[in-house]
Amino acid sequence: MRDMMGMMKQAKELQAKMKAMQDEIATMEASASSGGGLVTVTLSGKGTLSALKIDPSLMKEDEVEILEDLIIAAHNDAKAKLEAAMAEKTQSLTAGLPIPPGFKLPF
């Protein structure tokens, strides 16, 4: 019975920590550039695009495809950075918990 109470207490503490971590992640931002800094993308912690900067030299009709590729590359890099930061925070929160390999938390 004591073990069950201890597990319930741990679960409640984990829930509070997860909420705090989710709030912290929501305020995070990740930025990445491509094309030597010609395009910069910033994503919020929720994964939404919050800023896009494009060097005016790319605003030429014959360079549309290059611009599109640079935006996609910068976005993908920013997303990878954001996911890495989220994974790091999640790992620090769940350290020491008996979570099965491959189990994904719901956030």
Swiss-Prot record:
Species this protein is from: Brucella canis (strain ATCC 23365 / NCTC 10854 / RM-666)
InterPro entries with a match to the protein in the record: YbaB-like_sf, YbaB/EbfC
HAMAP family membership: DNA_YbaB_EbfC
Record's subunit section: Homodimer.
Name this polypeptide is given: Nucleoid-associated protein BCAN_A0034
Gene Ontology cellular component annotations, sorted alphabetically: bacterial nucleoid; cytosol
Record-annotated membrane-spanning stretches: none
Cell compartment(s), UniProt: Cytoplasm, Nucleoid
Family: Belongs to the YbaB/EbfC family.
Pfam family of the protein (one): YbaB_DNA_bd
